[in-house]
Amino acid sequence: DIKRKESVIINFLIIIQETNMNSKKMQSNLMLLLTAFIWGVAFVAQSVGMDYVGPFTFNSVRNFIGTFVLLLFIPLLDKVNRQSAATVNASNSDAVSATDIASTSSSSVSDKKTLIIGGIVCGILLAIASSFQQVGIIYTTVGKAGFITAMYIVIVPILGLFVGKKVRLIAWISVGLSVIGLYLLCMTESLSLGKGDILVLICAFCFSFHIMVVDYFSPKVDGVRMSCIQFFTCGIICGIPAMLTESPNLHAILTAWQPLLYAGVLSCAVGYTLQIVAQKNTDPVIASLLMSLESAFSLLAGWIILHQYLSPKELCGCLLMFAAIMLSQIPEKKSVAA
């Protein structure tokens, strides 16, 4: 009877743990969906902002705004984390030894190094990707740019294979549906690789590496701090060509304050931070699929804000993409022990 009760309790705890894990995955997926919405609407801000400032200036200023906003919120988040940690420690009756303290101190130094490296690498990739995208849009249509950029949903699983990640068959099916959906959604003319197309294709590869790098570093470091370092790095890198080629002035920047604030506060500070935090508890392939919905949301934002209407073909593309997202959420079957 005692063994039976212990078995029941253990099974109950396992069920609770699995439920919490599934709940975290669902929350992460919803965060990534919100990220896609924010980024989709940001295309409107980018379009309007480019009427006043150059692409490098826009990217530099928006990233510095994102850095500043996160710096304001980091102390508040630290306070919340300390309160949570204090609650956990209060419920733990085990004493902390000197060895544990020394180990924690050593680990803290290592974590800071990993945080800085991760933030800088992510910032470099973000600067390259966003710059290629912003400049590429000048030489190609928005439809082509949206389709080619979203090709990272195909590139990510391929890159994952090289680092030993297994990709489920259902994920590949979802990728295929997403590619077809993106084609119907974004393409308004025959596909041909011109100067702008090549630049945006490079952007797609850079975003793919960015997703993989975030997937590597995010479980090891504080996501908000890494995001802050990422934006600061990106702002500096984009600022160099801005000063050399665009001669930005304060009047032009202030004139574009509305799109810059949206892109800096929501698209950068909120969007990329949600991406980093959410990717701790979800698969990078599913993450890339969810974030690829920014193309759908950008068309919806153009329809509502700029009064650009969706054609039946584009609506079919939206439906296919949502079908792919739903399909990718089907859980993997687990073998049950006898």
Question: Predicted regions span which residues?
Answer:
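Glycine-/small-residue-enriched transmembrane alpha-helix faces in small-molecule transporters
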Residues: 4, 9-61, 123-124, 128, ...
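Juxtamembrane helix-entry segments on the extracytoplasmic side of multipass membrane proteins
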Residues: 24-29, 52-56, 60, 111-115, ...
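Hydrophobic/small/kink-forming positions within alpha-helical transmembrane segments
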Residues: 40, 44, 71, 123, ...
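Specific transmembrane alpha-helical segments of multi-pass solute transporters/efflux pumps
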Residues: 42-43, 77-89, 96-149, 184, ...
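Transmembrane alpha-helical segments that form core, pore/gating elements
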Residues: 56, 67-70, 155-157, 192-246, ...
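Helix-helix packing/entry segments at the starts of transmembrane helices
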Residues: 59-61, 145-151, 214-235, 268-304
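C-terminal-most transmembrane helix of multi-pass membrane proteins
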Residues: 63, 71-72, 76-79, 256, ...
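Hydrophobic transmembrane alpha-helices of multi-pass small-molecule transport proteins
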Residues: 70, 167-187, 207, 238, ...
